Amino acid sequence: MKVLIVALALLALAASAASSTSGGCGCQTPPFHLPPPFYMPPPFYLPPQQQPQPWQYPTQPPQLSPCQQFGSCGVGSVGSPFLGQCVEFLRHQCSPAATPYGSPQCQALQQQCCHQIRQVEPLHRYQATYGVVLQSFLQQQPQGELAALMAAQVAQQLTAMCGLQLQQPGPCPCNAAAGGVYY
């Protein structure tokens, strides 16, 4: 019996020690679980958009294809500022076969035309020259396929007179309904 009293006393002592560390009320408080930490990325900083200053714009104009420069692959380019002197050269019938070819006016127009052809990118010279020649032919005497064949020959002669070689690229991505010409 003494053993039982000693055991109960030890239990009471252990219980009182536990109650003094757990808040003093004699009961244990349930453990408080914090939610897992929430990860928040650091704030993302975007610098303010700056408009380019006028002096920062490129000074070179974008390179245009002959379709963009001359419209419909050169057809309809009679008013084109790029080969306007060639139009005049053809309009005055200044060609090796024509009699006024040796006139001073034809020689001046030829020089100006050659200068303008040299300004066209080499890959696009044939398309540009052909388009101007064809348009000139069609305005004078619309002959369809025959005019197209003659225009090809004259375009080659014209560039040869200027001392230039032609590079004949593939067809221009224009359609015939828009007045385009397939070579």
UniProtKB/Swiss-Prot annotation:
Localization: Vacuole, Aleurone grain
Question: Principal localization?
Answer: other
InterPro entries noted in UniProt: Bifun_inhib/LTP/seed_sf, Bifunc_inhib/LTP/seed_store, Glia_glutenin, Glutelin
Keyword Nucleotide-binding belongs to the record: no
Recorded superkingdom: Eukaryota
Q: Which UniProt keywords apply?
A: Repeat, Seed storage protein, Signal, Storage protein, Vacuole
Repeat listed as a keyword: yes
SUPFAM superfamilies with a match to the protein in the record: Bifunctional inhibitor/lipid-transfer protein/seed storage 2S albumin
Leader sequence range is 1-19
Q: What's a single GO CC term here?
A: vacuole
Offer an example of a GO molecular function term for this protein.
Answer: nutrient reservoir activity
Name the job this protein performs.
Answer: Zeins are major seed storage proteins.
Known partners and oligomeric status? Interacts with OP10 (via N-terminus).
This chain belongs to the protein called: 16 kDa gamma-zein
